[in-house]
Amino acid sequence: MGKKQKNKSEDSTKDDIDLDALAAEIEGAGAAKEQEPQKSKGKKKKEKKKQDFDEDDILKELEELSLEAQGIKADRETVAVKPTENNEEEFTSKDKKKKGQKGKKQSFDDNDSEELEDKDSKSKKTAKPKVEMYSGSDDDDDFNKLPKKAKGKAQKSNKKWDGSEEDEDNSKKIKERSRVNSSGESGDESDEFLQSRKGQKKNQKNKPGPNIESGNEDDDSSFKIKTVAQKKAEKKERERKKRDEEKAKLRKLKEKEESETGKKDQSKQKESQRKSEEETVKSKVTLDTGVIPASEEKAETPTAAEDDNEGDKKKKDKKKKKGEKEEKEKEKKKGPSKATVKAMQEALAKLKEEEERQKREEEERIKRLEELEAKRKEEERLEQEKRERKKQKEKERKERLKKEGKLLTKSQREARARAEATLKLLQAQGVEVPSKDSLPKKRPIYEDKKRKKIPQQLESKEVSESMELCAAVEVMEQGVPEKEETPPPVEPEEEEDTEDAGLDDWEAMASDEETEKVEGNTVHIEVKENPEEEEEEEEEEEEDEESEEEEEEEGESEGSEGDEEDEKVSDEKDSGKTLDKKPSKEMSSDSEYDSDDDRTKEERAYDKAKRRIEKRRLEHSKNVNTEKLRAPIICVLGHVDTGKTKILDKLRHTHVQDGEAGGITQQIGATNVPLEAINEQTKMIKNFGRENVRIPGMLIIDTPGHESFSNLRNRGSSLCDIAILVVDIMHGGEPQKMKPTNLPKPKKCPFMVALNKIDRLYDWKKSPDSDVAATLKKQKKNTKDEFEERAKAIIVEFAQQGLNAALFYENKDPRTFVSLVPTSAHTGDGMGSLIYLLVELTQTMLSKRLAHCEELRAQVMEVKALPGMGTTIDVILINGRLKEGDTIIVPGVEGPIVTQIRGLLLPPPMKELRVKNQYEKHKEVEAAQGVKILGKDLEKTLAGLPLLVAYKEDEIPVLKDELIHELKQTLNAIKLEEKGVYVQASTLGSLEALLEFLKTSEVPYAGINIGPVHKKDVMKASVMLEHDPQYAVILAFDVRIERDAQEMADSLGVRIFSAEIIYHLFDAFTKYRQDYKKQKQEKFKHIAVFPCKMKILPQYIFNSRDPIVMGVTVEAGQVKQGTPMCVPSKNFVDIGIVTSIEINHKQVDVAKKGQEVCVKIEPIPGESPKMFGRHFEATDILVSKISRQSIDALKDWFRDEMQKSDWQLIVELKKVFEII
């Protein structure tokens, strides 16, 4: 037994040392314990079990010998529910340990059996004791946290003290506490008691018999000191440590991320070097000084997991530690040697160097990172700007499409797609689907309604199919939600960037998913970034140089292959830069435009065609041949009746002017003058080198001269290369004579002046076969003087316009001085000189302008219906060439018309294009020519706008848009009124002329149209019958009126005025308006009451009653026959109606303000006659009795007869009569 006790005491000392080490660990690195609370608890439980087992053996041996065993058992029964049973037994038995050591062996077997019983009782316990065990372990922790020094002192004192006193005290305390528990005191006290018991048990376990008392004293003192505040403080301390640890972890994570973005390998190498160096330094330090660094001490402390495994090795470790300590103490006594000091110094120097090197590297790394960050920010900024530009372009594109009416909503796009699908289906089934343009314009056939049912059925089928497909896609999407690729964490930025087009982005994402999941069902779109590139290219082509345009075009021609390569490159970039934000942005931009791919196939084709057209135009502008000249377009301008057409007639030997309505040109005509005719006309000019003529001929355009046709003049002079301004030498200072000179100036068109009608000079002798300069010399002196005088006057007028002018034979500088050519269209004098000058000027000054160019430029001048040919268009071909069979796009009333050229007709040389001739048919026509084009659907063509040729089918929509833009500009200039006449003309030019004329004449127009008058035009005009019947009129200028339209107009009451001359039309309309007004005035003359105010002259009362005849002064307004009079001052008494007015015994209809007249006032029929002196006095003012109806009648039909003062009087009388 003695041996056993000795062994046990040794074990307890070892445990004591162990606990000391643990306490040190807790003080140094309490955080580690908190990190793994569960492990530590498990460890303590195991330790507790071992200790309980050792103590149970001893105590149960002592239990049999003790005298107070029975009393303790009774106590145990009272506290059966509590887990303090064993503890009480242990404490009571320990009190009697020394008394009963002899009977230990005898009762050893009994103790074993009791031990088994105790274990069974422990297993039967509920969860409550477990919780108390944990509480006990917490107290143990508290105990372990006590400082080392205090414990050491306590141990030393324990060796000296005797344990008997402590045993007695313990037994007393146990009894008292058991009584408290049995008497049912509060549970808190029992808990405290249990904790104290467990603490004491720990002390007993840690220290052998002689040290029991001091341990208990320590325990008691620890429990006394530990208040609630202390516990809270400790808890706070633990929480703080936890927070510190979390922060440290976060820091580590951040450092890791930074190191990952940087060069990982270098950082690892540095760390490994640093660690190795530190270890070497530490090992040297420990060897030299014997001082273990705190970090190593911490490392040496065993973890909770190691403690379980190292339970058996504790003894050996402790012995080793003791040995080490002794060695260290010896080394300390000796002190460090010189070698060690030197080694330490070297190590420190190395450390310093290493630290400096690391510092430098760290600074370099930070600098690099900063540079990278700056670079990244710059890239982000550029990317942002790029995105904003794209957004702006997209916005502009959408606005453009919106303006053009091409911006479709999702539903519209779907509808279009369905329609396209139905068309394809019809074509697949073999049904011929004619194109919109190729359909012949026919009268409506009622079979169409039946035909429409077939496509509707097919469309419904198509809709159902598309619905099924959509449903399938949705099912697939629902079925595979896990596979959705989560976008990188730059999503919020992406959302910010695409706020404007947010909906498009979501659509794009959906479309991306669909393409990934349902590749079989969906159409695979090869080109992702194409629409965006095309947008950019389109803008760049407008702004950048030609070379860039060519490169882009080449890139475009490569097609989908190049785009796929681009995609691969972008994919590689994405994989390379995972942490960079750029790829995600690229993806976002892709996704933005992916959604466009479905709906912008047409747009892509449109852009491609647009670029092709632009490139072709550029190439043509480069390949200009200055050696080969085209025929110049010569425009004849001038005032009406100056003889423009007559000059051309003389040139052509025709009589066009005689055939014109009223001898006035109202349309633009064109004449081709061949080279032979030029040579013929200029044969009398001596210095004219016929061999040097490079131009193939001339195209002369005749324009109307009247002011109302200024737009036609404008149109003509915009085409022409050089202009002839015809001025009548006999009439100076005409309003329009100098006006045409303003036309060529803004157009930068050179011009020359023909001083026409020189044959009107007195005693002029004609000589058409000689030069005009020679002819002038042959004239008499008086004729010469008159000519010079008139010519000088015209030169002065030009000078007033800011132009230098001189007679052509005196002009030495044609660039600065305008040449004046005296001509006579009647006799033919000066015509040769005129043509000679034209040829000279065009060849010398306009060679670049006349250089041959393949780029087509043509203008529609007139639209004419010819018998046997249908509707034809007269076109001035300025540049390029036209071939039979070309697809042309011409402007139309209801939009651009696409048609094929059926025939190209040219009038014979020297014949007017607009006059019916025996036309010559050509397969191809070169510029410059006046051509008549035959084709389908040309009825609604608008004159005055360009004609375009589409060489490929995809160019048609681009050219259509160009024409629509042109047409919008011209029609926006025409502003319609709510009330007004309906105007129809044969051409856009004449329509504009007529509208200009109506505007100056203050005639409002509510509707316009070009072409013959149909029933629909009459219907439109009839709307005015409801608003204002005087404007229910159609002014038809130079157009045919359909018979059914005339019949309908007659039945509805719409007047149609038709005339071939603009002035006749206007005269007819003004006459109609006047007649209509007279009718209305006659109708409303009894309702309309003119305002007047009269003062009675009391000395001129000729008859006071029935009728009242008296003299009055008109104070305001005007008195007319039939004006009802009343007296406002006498309760508005009606005195009668003015039947006659006399001035100086002469009867008049009206008496104005300030006149003294005699009036005869007859009583109102059916009323008693009023009397002067009874019903009204001489002091009373007489006024005309007005009403709302009378005021309206005056406004509508008698406005011309009213003056401003009359309207002011009406306002005054309205207040008197309280008229609203």
From Swiss-Prot:
It catalyses: GTP + H2O = GDP + phosphate + H(+). GO terms for cellular component: mitochondrion. Transmembrane segments: none annotated. It is found in: Cytoplasm. Residues 109-118, 491-516, 531-569 have a biased composition (Acidic residues). Its cofactor is a monovalent cation. Residues 756-759 are annotated as: G4. Its EC number is 3.6.5.3. Residues 702-705 are annotated as: G3. This is Eukaryotic translation initiation factor 5B. It comes from Pongo abelii.
